[in-house]
Curated annotation (Swiss-Prot):
Signal peptide boundaries: none
UniProt protein name: rRNA-processing protein efg1
Its biological purpose: Involved in rRNA processing.
Pfam families tied to this protein: Efg1
Originating species: Aspergillus fumigatus (strain ATCC MYA-4609 / CBS 101355 / FGSC A1100 / Af293) (Neosartorya fumigata)
Encoding gene per record: efg1
Region (Disordered): 1-52, 181-204, 230-319
Compartmental location: Nucleus, Nucleolus
Amino acid sequence: MPREFSREKRAHSDSTTTSKRKYHEGSEDSQPAKKKKVHPPKHEHNYPSVNELKKRIRDVKRLLNRVDLPADARIVQERALAGYEKDLEDELARRHRSQMIKKYHFVRFLDRKAASKDLKRLLRREQEISNSDLDPAAKKEKLAALAGKIHAAQVNHNYTIYYPLTQKYVALYAEQKKKKKESSAQSEKPSEPEAEVASKLIYDTTGERPPMWRVVEKCMEDGTLDLLREGKLDGSEKGEKSSQAPEQKKSKKSTDDDQYARNKSSTEKVSDKPSGKSRKSGGKQDRKPKRSAAMEGAYWSANEHDDDDIESDGGFFEA
């Protein structure tokens, strides 16, 4: 009886009381555990290794220098060589582009900030003049004078954005820091209107505009600023495309022909030259008769002396 009573009591207590680990009010265990967010791995570009590409190019060239290489295998290796060289060229260009972007990023940022500030100021000045109560003739004259300055400011702004990324950046506002002292010294003089001061500051800091400034202006008219930024234009003042489709095909074909001719000439040179073993054997054959002739002369001279000695010995014993 006591055992049965204890079992019933234990079962009753288990049914009425809850576990200590389950949902106590005011405790931290009452909240379910939060699941950790699993972030997907970032997609990393697997760019080819430059050293690996160079090694493959050396191996293929070494294989093409063999004289006994079959024709079909030679064609396959020449195509592989052209592909490896193209991959190497693209990878080097990509690395150069990335390096130039990192190098001139801050300078371009400062120039873009200054150019956008000046452009906004000139546009604000133009709006003020157009909304002012001036004579139509005077208003037209001022707007015409301000239009050239706005155009120069727009070219400056596009210059800082669409300058070719793969070329050395020439700053427009490089002389601004040098002229801070001069401007502070001349600040006591009566100042001109804000727009005129800003436009003169742009012209002074620009100085002799770099050649790319005219290219940017031409590309603004043609609508090819994106191509200029990516380096797909030749960078001349005309702004024409440097890599057109037919010219690319012709140049590529000519380079392939030159490469094939170079490989063919190198193989012919290798075939004309004797191998290492033949050169060594030929050298030995050429040197061997010279050595034998010298030794024969020494041998015969030694034999003559020996004959004289024998004759003298014979005469001595005879005596």
